[in-house]
């Protein structure tokens, strides 16, 4: 998704990102 919270529960940057393993990486 873009920003918000990952399925894993950690916070993500407001930019578009993808969750991998247990962390968010900017796409």
Swiss-Prot record:
Notes concerning its domains: The cysteine framework is IX (C-C-C-C-C-C).
Protein name: Conotoxin Bt9.2
Annotated localization: Secreted
Molecular function, one GO term: toxin activity
Keyword field: Disulfide bond, Hydroxylation, Ion channel impairing toxin, Neurotoxin, Secreted, Toxin
Tissue specificity annotation: Expressed by the venom duct.
Entry annotated with the keyword Secreted: yes
Lineage, broadest ranks: Eukaryota, Metazoa, Spiralia, Lophotrochozoa, Mollusca
GO CC annotations, alphabetized: extracellular region
Reported function: Probable neurotoxin that inhibits ion channels.
Modification 4-hydroxyproline, positions: 13
Family as reported in the entry's similarity comment: Belongs to the conotoxin P superfamily.
Major localisation: secreted
Disulfide bonds: 2-16, 6-19, 12-24
Extent of the signal sequence: none
């Amino acid at each position: 998704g873009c920003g918000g919270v990952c399925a894993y529960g950690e916070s993500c940057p407001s930019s578009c990102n993808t969750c991998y393993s247990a962390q968010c990486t900017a796409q």
